[in-house]
């Protein structure tokens, strides 16, 4: 059975630059508004999908809309995305041996650069449907709190 880990990196992850000039990736996301908020879809927010397109690693939406993104922002975002993926791979590995990684979900397009300790990275057909499958098979949990007055008894 493969080990599965969900990562907060997706196509709608917001890209920013902090006060020190450091590029940030997430944790906030445009979520399901990706197709209206991302630059490549005519929006005004820089997302990780825009970085993929600006890097020439994906052809989604209007490529011309990301030509003005500064190269240092693109490179910084790619480095940060790679750091996030690298950390996840290292956290999941049980030995130093190289592994094969299977990426699914909307954020799987974020894989752009080689990862240390990974011999092969697979992004299967229909990879973006994994989010729907995950939501469909998720276990639902809940908690009920009942209070009972010891003097008067249960009052439901």
Put a short name on every predicted segment:
Residues 1-156:
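Helical "lid/coupling" subdomains associated with nucleotide-phosphate turnover
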């Amino acid at each position: 059975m493969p080990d599965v880990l969900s990562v907060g990196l997706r196509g709608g992850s917001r890209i920013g630059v902090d006060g020190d000039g450091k590029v940030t990736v997430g944790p906030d996301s445009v979520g399901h508004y990706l197709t209206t908020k991302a630059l490549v879809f005519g929006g005004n927010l820089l997302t990780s999908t825009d970085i993929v397109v600006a890097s020439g690693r994906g052809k989604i939406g209007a490529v011309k809309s990301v030509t003005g993104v500064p190269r240092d922002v693109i490179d910084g975002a790619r480095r940060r995305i790679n750091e996030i993926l690298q950390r996840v791979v290292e956290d999941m590995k049980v030995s130093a041996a190289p592994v094969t990684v299977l990426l699914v979900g909307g954020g799987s397009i974020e894989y752009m650069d080689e990862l240390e300790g990974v011999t092969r990275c697979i992004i299967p057909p229909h990879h973006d449907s994994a989010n729907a499958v995950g939501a469909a098979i998720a276990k639902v949990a809940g908690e009920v709190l009942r209070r009972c007055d010891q003097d008067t008894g249960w009052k439901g």
